[in-house]
Regions:
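Edge strands and adjacent loops of beta-rich recognition modules
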Residues: 228-244
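Surface-exposed extracellular loop regions of Gram-negative outer-membrane beta-barrel proteins
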Residues: 279-289
């Protein structure tokens, strides 16, 4: 392609963002990143700590045997817990939006779920009088959104988040218990392998909420039916055992503040404040609070960040471009060891996932999933292509296990879900186009590298059949306008909170890497993405718009992903070449002005819970500008030869 941009400015921008990304390493081996502080997480943590403090012990604090207590948590417990809670309440007060509500981040519009949870936290702390005007304004916002009815409407029948939110509100005496739907927690006592057959009202990764929140509802508002009442009473002890077995060493379910908080507050409210699950959950909350009194939605996305960063950098952790060494340096070897050690080698107790997958984090609360496993496979294949003679046995062994893991969770519809095969009732358990595209990329990235083509034809046939079915799923789920919708990413300025730019860019990248850029679905997707480009050259919100401040119209993340797919397709379509040039120019200007340090809240964590990750714009921009830089140099060299 002919990339008509200033190659010197491009190289300088690439160097800026690349060095910034390298400087963000938590250690020589990996990137922990930093998730946005979350009013929703902070509110649920406050509620959990307050309800635990009001529990059955004289001090309201968990009792640890000598030598068992964690030092940091113990120090906070021995001090004044109320000081932490008041600091967190002050932080929440500072985050209120002009319309009276709260959003999921400091860059998010208000939503009814977060606002109701913040209200509950204020009520439970016993300090609403000090914030009377604040609470009055928030109630006006909640009323304008439809109250409890509006909350249920937001989650469209998915009880995973709606019921825990209503439970939190009921514990704060904001909502009567009769408005909190009951959850059949007794079903958790059945064998885990049956869960996907039970038509549960929550997603596969929310069993802890099913148990704890379900028990809270049962305790505070038992069912009238004596048979149901007896059945659930008899299942309490067994399901608490399930909860105990699922809790990771860190105490944080999924390393997630909201999920852990819902479990802690629910059990504490029924007199189980000294239960080991509650004690470990409180320890997790106290260990994960930030200096300003806020909590993120999760501890970190270290594995996800690291896999993508290593791929974007092509395993070159040196300031020099290209790297001066012909073999991996010590820090590169360390990064490989770290990523290999993140692979789960045993069946996971939380979802029953088989060995072989990767989670989003290296911490104990992580659970293997398709997106992170695919990212790790892409990173490892980049290593194998760069250094085929180095650590080949270890890398190939991990890759084979990862591919087998992905093949094992492919759904019957041909698509890939996030965590578990066969859970198709609720949106966040269904197959999705972005995850399916990533799984296909992860598997296909190892073509020709495993050296098994001639000795394991059965494995190859499985891969070919899985690929065929995956492509069929993606084709069948293409939108009429040519775009694809992702599952775990959105755009808050879109009226449906959808992000077809992210989804379409991910699918187009897959089409390029699988060698099908000229397929009908790829060409339709390409035309849609070209037409979605803003006049300024970037990508961002498309379709019906709710609010659209000028500075939020385009993001570095969306522009980088879309531009990379345009660069990949530029040899096949002149419109892609023109769009790529405009996208690269937009990114150069964005990096020169420092916008790559301003992440956008495009991530979903659970259903409709927004977040941003500080490293996303840096990782995505590093990847696309590396590709653009190579294209620019190729053009310059060709011109020099002529």
């Amino acid at each position: 392609m002919t990339l008509q941009v200033d190659c010197e400015r491009l190289a300088a921008a690439h160097l800026i963002v690349r060095r910034q990304l390298l400087a963000e390493r938590s250690a020589p081996s990996h990137w922990s990143g930093e998730l946005s502080s979350s009013p929703l997480s902070t509110a649920t943590a406050i509620s959990a700590l307050v309800l635990a403090e009001q529990g059955g012990t004289s001090s309201g604090l968990p009792v640890y045997t000598p030598g068992e207590e964690p030092s940091h948590a113990h120090e906070i417990y021995r001090g004044d817990l109320s000081e932490l809670i008041l600091q967190s309440v002050r932080w929440l007060a500072e985050q209120q939006n002009e319309d009276g509500g709260w959003g999921d981040t400091d860059r998010s519009v208000s939503n009814i779920a977060t606002t109701m949870l913040v209200q509950a936290a204020f009520h439970l702390t016993g300090v609403p009088a000090k914030y009377g005007n604040l609470l009055q304004r928030s109630q006006e916002y909640v009323d304008s959104q439809g109250g409890v009815t509006g909350l249920k409407r937001r989650y469209e029948g998915d009880k995973t988040f709606a019921v825990p939110i209503l439970t939190n509100c009921a514990l704060a005496d904001m909502v009567p218990w009769r408005k909190v739907p009951a959850l059949p927690f007794e079903l958790a006592s059945l064998p885990q392998r049956w869960y996907h057959l039970l038509n549960l009202p929550v997603v596969s990764y929310a069993i802890p909420a099913l148990v704890a929140v379900g028990q809270a509802k049962f305790h505070h508002a038992p069912p009238r039916n004596p048979l149901v009442r007896w059945l659930r009473a008899s299942a309490r002890k067994r399901t608490l055992g399930v909860l105990t077995d699922m809790q990771p060493a860190s105490g944080g379910f999924l390393e997630a503040t909201p999920l852990t908080s819902f479990v802690v507050m629910s059990l504490a409210s029924i007199g189980l404040d000294e239960h080991p699950v509650v004690r470990r959950g409180i320890e997790f909350l106290l260990m994960s609070v930030r200096p300003d009194g806020s909590w993120p939605i999760d501890s970190n996305l270290a594995t996800w960040n690291t896999s993508q960063a290593l791929t974007a950098l092509n395993w070159n952790l040196s300031d020099q471009l290209p790297a001066a060494t012909t073999k991996p340096t010590d820090d590169v070897e360390s990064a490989l060891d770290w990523l290999l050690n993140c692979q789960h080698t045993q069946r996971h107790p939380f979802t029953g996932a088989a060995a072989g997958g990767w989670a989003w984090t290296d911490l104990s609360g992580g659970v293997p999933d398709a997106d992170d496993t695919s990212a790790a496979l892409c990173a490892l294949s980049a290593w194998q292509r760069r250094w085929p003679q180095q650590r080949g046995t270890d890398v190939k062994r991990a890759a084979r296990a990862g591919i087998h893991w992905l093949l094992g969770i492919q759904n019957s519809d041909g698509g890939w879900p996030t965590f578990c095969r066969g859970w198709g009732k609720l949106q966040f358990d269904r197959s999705s186009c972005d995850i399916t595209a990533h799984a296909l990329r992860g598997i296909y990235s190892w073509r020709g590298l495993l050296q098994i083509e001639s000795v394991n034809t059965t494995f190859i046939k499985k891969i070919e059949e899985a690929t065929r079915r995956g492509l069929q799923f993606i084709s069948q789920n293409q939108q009429p306008d040519g775009s694809w919708m992702p599952l775990w990413f959105g755009n808050q300025w879109n009226a449906q909170e959808a992000n077809p730019v992210y989804g379409t860019a991910k699918v187009l990248t897959m089409c390029h890497e699988l060698g099908i850029p000229r397929s009908e679905m790829a060409q339709r997707g390409l035309l849609w993405l070209v037409n979605a480009q803003h006049a300024a050259g970037g990508w961002g919100v498309v379709g019906p718009v709710t609010k659209n401040p000028a500075d939020q119209a385009c993001s570095v993340e969306e522009t980088a992903l879309a531009t990379e797919s345009m660069l990949q397709f530029s040899p096949h379509h002149p419109l892609a070449e023109e769009a790529a040039q405009q996208g690269v120019s937009w990114l150069i200007e964005a990096i020169e002005s420092g916008r790559h340090l301003e992440p956008a809240a495009i991530g979903f964590y659970f259903s409709k819970l927004w977040y941003y990750e500080r490293l996303y714009p840096q990782i995505f921009a590093t990847s696309v500008l590396a590709r653009a830089n190579r294209a620019c140099h190729a053009v310059s060299q060709a011109a020099g030869v002529m």
